[in-house]
Amino acid sequence: MKVVKICFLVLWMALIFSFSNQRDVDSSKISDGFIDRTVVKIYKVFNENITKEKENEIIEKYTYPIRKLAHYTLYFILGILAFLVVKDYSINKKLIIYSLLICFLYACSDEFHQLFIIGRSASIKDVMIDTFGSLCGISIFYIFNKKISKKSV
């Protein structure tokens, strides 16, 4: 089971790497497409007559928060996966610290990697969002894990 957990962690890291490896134009197309398929559709439910100009305005308005939410979510899941791996190898007291350290270092390396991609840059703000997402994932899963452990005793 340890190997399976490690594989999921590495595959998730590879997914994050693949997103970071996209040029800015390609990354924006994905974000804008997602916003068009979700947020714009929701707007259309409540307001049938949305012009193309209004659609573009909606996309522009929501691009930044959606992209940051994507960072948070990817690293929230990474935090859970790191926790599951570290749990198999770590003393309970250091579980959260080691899990968070893995995620923080990966977030730093991810931002460093983006320096070498056309149109991309590194952002300390993104590292902070990523780390916070990881901390939330780790914390929620830790609490959930504690409650399950108490019930089984």
Which residue ranges define each predicted feature?
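Membrane-interface loop-to-helix entry segments
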Residues: 64-78, 124-132
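Short, charged juxtamembrane terminal tails flanking transmembrane helices
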Residues: 149-153
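Residue-level signature of the transmembrane alpha-helical core
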Residues: 69, 100-108, 127, 131-135
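"…centered on the first transmembrane helix and the immediately adjacent amphipathic helix/loop
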Residues: 1-73
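Small-polar-interrupted transmembrane alpha-helices in polytopic inner-membrane proteins
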Residues: 11-16, 95-115
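Membrane-interfacial alpha-helical segments at the cytosolic side of multi-pass membrane proteins
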Residues: 74-88, 132-147
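Interfacial helix-loop-helix junctions of multi-pass membrane proteins
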Residues: 108-129
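Membrane-helix interface segments
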Residues: 2-4, 89-98, 123-124
